[in-house]
């Protein structure tokens, strides 16, 4: 119609995959194989198609592919903004206006909006600030049973990691893990710098509580997420074994990419 604003991977990669996935879903079929690419290629095992990502199904069933992509972009920018707002309020102790500025900067900033061409990356990154919100609620809480808080954190991390993995961009989960490590290290630096402050004992207690809970939450949440997403991870892992890049890339190839 010449009315669709799309370029690069959106138009050439995701539109065809989403259209094929939507057609399969409407016919109650799991698309294991793609017969339209070369002499055929695995479809489900290509995690970037995001067939099992739960927020893809409604837009696939209700909207034509171009509108489905647009709706998903808007939805996940909203999810990212709400998550950034809550994370800013809970993690940094910001007020309403500070949280709003955080939401706008994250959801409409250059990095996230640049990923609208890579819908699976946008979908995964939209959940990133929600990890900070869950972590802050669990690790900073002084109330409640320790194991209840650990369980709540593990459930939250499991659901969020599952959504990221099913969105189809595994690197986003890696980025999230690095973020949580940096966040923990920043907490450690904060506690060390304030060790002689009048609130030192309280900070020391929070510091010990933080490191008692963090490994448990990450291990439990990550383990449950792997089980929940095995329906996607196992076919993808099998496909990786057949890849020409299965042995990894040379440093020169990594840097040039």
Q: Which residues fall in each region the model found?
A:
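Membrane-interface coil-to-helix junctions
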Residues: 1-81, 104-126, 252-257
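Helix-to-loop transition at the C-terminal end of transmembrane segments
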Residues: 1-12, 230-247
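Membrane-embedded helix bundles of polyisoprenyl
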Residues: 75, 79-91, 96-145, 149-190, ...
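Membrane-interfacial, low-structure loops and terminal tails that flank and connect transmembrane helices
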Residues: 142-149, 190-215
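A glycine-rich phosphate-binding loop feature that marks nucleotide/adenosyl-phosphate handling sites
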Residues: 180, 220, 241-245, 254
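Amphipathic helix/helix-loop-helix segment enriched in hydrophobic residues with interspersed Lys/Arg
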Residues: 186, 210-214, 242-245
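Juxtamembrane inter-helical linkers in multi-pass membrane proteins
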Residues: 198-200, 247-257
């Amino acid at each position: 119609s010449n009315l669709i604003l799309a370029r690069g991977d959106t138009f050439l990669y995701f539109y065809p995959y989403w259209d094929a996935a939507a057609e399969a879903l409407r016919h109650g079929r799991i698309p294991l194989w793609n017969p339209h690419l070369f002499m055929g290629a695995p479809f489900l095992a290509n995690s970037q198609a995001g067939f099992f990502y739960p927020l893809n199904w409604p837009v696939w069933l209700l909207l034509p592919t171009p509108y489905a992509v647009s709706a998903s972009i808007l939805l996940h920018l909203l999810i990212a903004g709400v998550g950034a707002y809550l994370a800013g309020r809970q993690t940094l102790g910001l007020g309403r206006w500070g949280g709003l500025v955080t939401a706008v900067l994250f959801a409409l900033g250059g990095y996230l909006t640049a990923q609208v061409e890579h819908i699976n990356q946008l979908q995964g990154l939209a959940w990133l600030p929600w990890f900070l919100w869950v972590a802050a609620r669990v690790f900073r809480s002084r109330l409640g049973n320790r194991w209840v808080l650990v369980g709540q954190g593990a459930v939250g991390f499991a659901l969020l990691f599952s959504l990221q993995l099913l969105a189809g961009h595994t690197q986003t989960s890696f980025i999230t893990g690095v973020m949580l490590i940096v966040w923990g290290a920043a907490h450690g630096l904060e506690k060390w710098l304030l060790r002689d402050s009048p609130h030192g004992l309280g900070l020391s207690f929070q510091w010990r509580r933080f490191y008692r809970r963090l490994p448990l939450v990450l291990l439990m949440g990550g383990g449950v997420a792997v089980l929940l997403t095995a329906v996607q991870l196992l076919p993808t892992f099998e496909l990786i074994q057949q890849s020409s890049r299965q042995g990894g890339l040379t440093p020169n190839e990594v840097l040039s990419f």
